[in-house]
Structures are given as structure tokens and as C-alpha cells.
């Protein structure tokens, strides 16, 4: 992969929103995300962990409001809002992985292998499994 492909032009002024290179895999995303990680290096690991916790809380809060305010119905606007918060979580996960010297693809593959092993052993059921069949999802 050519690191030149990963350059960001966040200061570009044009008719479109800020320009960026679209990513096609997790490691490329991680490299691009790292370019926007602006926090003191002595806060590595701590800063992204706290940020991830906050963003995950925002995801949970939006889902809570679906239950409380929207009669368990998810509309396209809520999908976009939740997706944006998940994107923020992904950024924090990405820079946290980078801070500890891990590639996102390695983490993802190790997790999939762990899940496949659990499935094979018949232990892929977890405790306190929740069913979301009562939610009404938007149709595309």
C-alpha cells in the first residue's frame, strides 16, 4: 500500500465537504485515522479509551431514545445518527489499536477466529443474550 494514497486534505476549500481518501480496508482506515489523532502522546492509550467510552455511551443513549421516545421504531435519521456515533467509536478503536501497536485487521481476524472456534464448540451463545426482534427496522 502506498502511504501517499492515505494523505488527507482536511484544509481543502471546495464546494464539497472536506476531502479525504476513501478507504477499502481496516488497516488503511487506521492509517488515515492516525493522521487526525491530535492528543498528547503521554496520554496515548488513556485518551482514546476515555473517548471510546464516551462515544459508546452516545450510541447507547440514541438506542435508549428509540425505546423511550420512538416506540421501538428506527427511522432513517436515527440510523444515520447511530452510524455517525459508531464511526466515532471506530476512530477511537483505531487510534487505541495504533497506540498499543496493533493493526485493526489483526484484531478483527483474531476476533473472528475466536468466534468461529466458539461456534464450532457450540459455545457461541453468551450470557444474557438479548433479542432485538421487537425493533422495527427501516426498509431500504
Language-model-detected regions and their locations in the chain:
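Conserved small/polar residues in nucleotide/adenosyl-binding loops
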Residues: 133-139
